[in-house]
């Protein structure tokens, strides 16, 4: 990072009204990855994924711009953040202002610590020897790194790695944190939540390392990217007596915004493809699966399922002859069966068009595809316009966390949708699965 970027980030932090670890103000302030990563909702996800000691005394070595420091200050009794660079140290002070738990230093402070967090560049033998001597009897060390090379230095300092966690895409802004066992036990789910290579590691050391990551937990992943804080969630993949389960919860309890909210949900893990994946491989099943999904929506509504809004085809597993809903976290108080069915068809058309679905008509647009899919289950093709309007409104709320002052964002999302509806399916194929899908609640309002 250049000195100019560092000064800009420090200035942004000095001017921000909300410097919390889930600050929307900061999350959406960065212009590029260099600026965004230190301000991201997910900057502290690697620590959110851990079971930290209750009211710990924490030492952080290499505080950077305070993304981890802020979170630690919100959950710990005492945090000593060490940052030698004066510009970054100032940034940490701005990020943690108002927290009586945090003090920022330019050198190590001699105390006893329950948790020590070390960034890789500082993980030298001398530092690690010093840290080992100042760990409490149940203390733990977390080293954040992009390389396993530091493991030898840790071992030489008497801090053998007790557990290695993979961070995707990296530890700086981790969307998924997982142990290696999930790759062999649940390979389909592991690939889905990782979304690509793991370029970061969290190495857990010390006598208290095992408690940071319980043996029953396989992975933790987050939806914090393009959502307002009220809609950010975490999901823990845990072993159960019957296999494994995904348990989702909001990161912060929040009231609905214009009837939109997220809530907890739990799903048993099945080794089965989603409805979208099946349709990409077996397009001839489209009428069968669409009809089955529509009937499933009706059945779940009759059972009083609260999160009906999320019951769309990419959240349905095809487990043999059984359709199984998963990941039902979004609630929309204004939506009933017809609105959910129309939404599901619209979003399905977008995902199939994104993949250049071979069963789409030659020369046809995504709008044409959505209309045709709708006809298969009794919808008039004109449903697209109403479904689009609702999806834009939903995406705007999910991204902004408010219904006020959002005209610019709403207009941008609507324009993205108009362009996608107009594109010719067979002339378009994303270079990345799911890239740019404005309907996906994790990718709304790219701005």
Task: Go through each PLM region and give its residues.
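Catalytic activation segment of kinase domains across protein kinase-like and atypical kinase folds
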Residues: 303-358
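Conserved SAM-binding loop of SAM-dependent methyltransferases across substrates and taxa
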Residues: 65-76
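Class I SAM-dependent methyltransferase SAM/SAH-binding core
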Residues: 75-101
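Conserved class I S-adenosyl-L-methionine
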Residues: 55-64
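Rossmann-like AdoMet/SAM-dependent catalytic core
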Residues: 167-243
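A short glycine-rich, Lys/Arg-flanked "PGG" loop and its adjoining helix->strand segment in the class I
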Residues: 126-137
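N-terminal auxiliary segments of SAM/dcSAM-dependent transferases
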Residues: 1-19
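Conserved alpha-helix/loop element of class I SAM-dependent methyltransferases that forms part
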Residues: 37-56
